[in-house]
């Protein structure tokens, strides 16, 4: 994880799930179970297909059937760091790695996801210059994303 830019993993988790360890997206519907057992039950009921955990890992693609490791924040963070680093090595660009993370299918969609992550990065690592050249901090959606990220981070820190 140390080879990633400061705050990037936290910014991605803020963007993907609001740092909710058991968040699920099953067939386009969001679920926020109270515990891992309930989240695992819902994921199994969906046939192991869906986005799971604080990083919203695509369980149908990256997870063996019946396994629920994306619901373990530490395992998910280790996997996410490795996945991002692998794509950074391939592309030589953290923006492209984030686009690949999210599966952005176009440059426009890629820029949108990069800017959403950038707005959360301003909360996770204030003053970070990562992606600053790609996003307009004055845009309303950027400010909204930053406020949203700050609120989620405050709640997560209060629960620790």
Residue positions per predicted region:
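Long, low-complexity, intrinsically disordered segments
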Residues: 146-160
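Catalytic glycan-binding domains that act on GlcNAc-containing polysaccharides
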Residues: 1-142
